[in-house]
């Protein structure tokens, strides 16, 4: 199961005491700022969580799996995420059943 924007809004409402409208605006604003930064070619660094970065992939040859015909796959930019060491350690500790140390 994945954590959704609606669930993030509910968590802000429950844990911080914001009303639902304010919580939704904060979540939307956060996502919009991340989108804008990435669209402008900037990375997004969230301390203790990870980095969102852009990677340029060059054009490369591909193949249509149905016909076997060679077709070019166009150059594009993709968003990558690299988890911080802190996040990786917390996930691994949880997987092993160890207590979570922040």
Curated annotation (Swiss-Prot):
**PROSITE patterns the UniProt entry points to:** HISTONE_LIKE (PS00045)
GO MF, one term, reads: structural constituent of chromatin
Say yes or no: keyword Transcription present. Answer: yes
- Tell me the superkingdom of the source: Bacteria
Keyword terms of this UniProt record: DNA recombination, DNA-binding, Transcription, Transcription regulation, Translation regulation
Q: InterPro entries, per this entry?
A: Hist_DNA-bd, Histone-like_DNA-bd_CS, IHF-like_DNA-bd_dom_sf, IHF_alpha
Annotated region described as Disordered, given as residue ranges: 49-71
Q: Does the keyword Magnesium apply?
A: no
- Alphabetical list of Pfam families matching this protein: Bac_DNA_binding
Gene Ontology CC annotations of this record = cytosol
Q: Which GO terms describe its biological process?
A: DNA recombination; positive regulation of metabolic process; regulation of DNA-templated transcription; regulation of translation
> What is the annotated quaternary arrangement, including any partners?
Heterodimer of an alpha and a beta chain.
Q: What does this protein do?
A: This protein is one of the two subunits of integration host factor, a specific DNA-binding protein that functions in genetic recombination as well as in transcriptional and translational control.
**Recorded family membership:** Belongs to the bacterial histone-like protein family.
Database matches in PANTHER family: DNA-BINDING PROTEIN HU, INTEGRATION HOST FACTOR SUBUNIT ALPHA
Question: Which named protein is this?
Answer: Integration host factor subunit alpha
Lineage, top ranks: Bacteria, Pseudomonadati, Pseudomonadota, Betaproteobacteria, Nitrosomonadales
């Amino acid at each position: 199961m994945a954590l959704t924007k609606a669930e993030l809004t509910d968590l802000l409402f429950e844990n911080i005491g914001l009303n639902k409208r304010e919580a939704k605006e904060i979540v939307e604003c956060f996502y919009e700022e991340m989108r804008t930064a990435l669209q402008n070619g900037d990375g997004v660094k969230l301390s203790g969580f990870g980095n969102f970065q852009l990677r340029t992939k060059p054009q490369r040859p591909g193949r249509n799996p149905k016909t076997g015909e060679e077709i070019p796959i166009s150059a594009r930019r993709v968003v990558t995420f690299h988890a911080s060491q802190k996040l990786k350690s917390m996930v691994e500790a949880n997987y092993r059943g160890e207590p979570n140390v922040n």
